[in-house]
């Protein structure tokens, strides 16, 4: 934001509105249950079937190829640890320095005002535990395959499925999912827009739809980011305590679509979500690099370009440490590599700071966490290296292709005779659903499978 766009900041201590602890359904604690609301949310997520299923879902590599690889479950646990560390760091005075200069307000005053906004450990861990539970089997390949099959019924995307599981599918209640607090749900919404609006406009593109899943140009069907239109009722409830101005601003896209093949991305997210997303990015960039090194997917020669890029970044810490970090990353001594990984994670965590987003009335939207510009560039180098040498690795891509082919074929088979081939409960839901939502029932069933379960079902068919 420009300084001339900033409205006057009221320096009274901020108090979180009680509506953020409301649930969609009345849900008083059980007798003698004195847990605060976000601890109850954490327990529901931690004990859910959707969370347990993460132990058998791919982070990047196929489950069973190597026991060292992280699954989405171990990844989520590490994201929670980093998220809690970021929250602790954001309490320190130094993290208010940049915001103090932006607002021309003493950083001590900002610290007093804004610290109460920070999520509790229960809340940030809830978000980090939940952030990946909507991802289907076989990672982004599975996600794109399901989007291809659902393109005419609102599409499919992992973050949208996460919101759907939390608010509808997980059987803690009959029709409201886990019935989590409003603030927890706000924290998992990375992209506050409808998926069928944010995604490429497939009806205008006329992409070929090959009935044989082996020959689908799957790259054409990468989804945008958002919420399913089927879940609009819960999304509207989530935002109903915001002012009209805040709702409109919160759901804005970064730009206007220039061609139908373009995906649109929203501009804003909540404070809690920004912390969770930073934790996810740090875990992705650093821990997935560790997986790749340990299992021999990458070597020091491939790392040289990234090493050179990191040395060009105007960071005193990187200039002083990146040579030894790079050497220790590829050391034969496991403890040296572990020390290097720990040093990198600490570098990113200790460079977090407060940021003003826009003139929101709601303080949970007005402020975000961010990394300083040079540290953002550094994290981007790590993420790009993982993308280039791990995700785009031919073995990874073949596993992903195999997975997307299996999911596409399974979807077609289930759709051809659902009452015969779907499990009884799923078949009953399919039978009772209106015509326009029947495919969503099949999609929910497939998306909820682990990699191993999907493989077993495919082999049965």
From Swiss-Prot:
Compositionally biased residues, Basic and acidic residues:
24-41
**GO terms under biological process:** dGTP catabolic process
Sequence ranges assigned to domain HD in this UniProt record:
72-285
Give the keywords, sorted.
Hydrolase
Gene Ontology terms for molecular function: dGTPase activity
Top-rank taxon of the source lineage equals Bacteria
* Listed Pfam families: HD, HD_assoc
* Region Disordered, annotated ranges: 22-41
Q: Residues of the signal sequence?
A: none
Similarity remark: Belongs to the dGTPase family. Type 2 subfamily.
What HAMAP family does the database record attribute to this sequence?
dGTPase_type2
Q: What is this protein called?
A: Deoxyguanosinetriphosphate triphosphohydrolase-like protein
Q: Which organism is it from?
A: Haemophilus influenzae (strain PittGG)
Q: What is the lineage of its organism?
A: Bacteria, Pseudomonadati, Pseudomonadota, Gammaproteobacteria, Pasteurellales
